[in-house]
Amino acid sequence: MRGCFLDISKDDRYLLVGGYHDGRVSLMQLDPVEGTIVGIADGVFHKGMGRCIAERSSRPHVNCVRFTPDQRYVCAVDGGLDQVKLYHMDEDLGKIHNTDILRCQIDSAPKSMRFSDDGRFAYVLCELLNCVNVYRYEERNGEPEFHFLQEITTTDKKDDDICSATAMTISPDGKHLYVVNAGVNSAVIYDIDPETGMLTLNCNSKISGEFPKAVRVFPDNEHFMTLNHENDEICVFKMNYEEHYFLMQGKPLHVGKPNSVAIHKLQQ
């Protein structure tokens, strides 16, 4: 098991691990009181070939794993197979069973997945196609259903060949979706329609950093950070949603090869 992504169930009983190199989805049992790992409850290796058998990236690569908001299913985003594999989650037995496949566009390389705060909409970021796919999520007759709503680009058409959509997050208030692109080194902010879940471009601008690998929004919903892997720094920006621009706040923070980050608001 060589994990690259984690997700924890709402009841703190299970931990999902996504394996990029081995294409494995692992379900770990947790002690909900101590927070320690009890053991491996279940695991599944993805199989198959993707875009081209001559390319290394065509093999299964699990980039992201998520519990659905209702905690009934597991979503495993596989960038090598251009799929999101869907598993039924048996909480009592600690087992996952394949139930369906959400097929993305050919050569899209899905990278990340997020759900809206109300659990009605899902967003899938595609690394090679440089787009966000929007879906309406619901459970029907005991099965998960994802209804495609929208595909929206993360970059200008002229930059497609040098752009790679790398990370995505949603602001704490659920009103905005953020994406960062490597190659063109930009941050893109979208407004989320609360009724339809669809996205509208608010701002697209450079971040003055190389190869952003992560983006996170602070609890005030205005400030956000990018982790710029190639020049060893974290940059903080302030977003102006009404005027459609953001500005850097202070000097970059030097951190060696930053890769991921979590923000936790402390209680006063």
Where are the language model's segments positioned?
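Asp-box/WD-like beta-propeller blade repeats and closely related beta-sheet repeat scaffolds
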Residues: 1-63
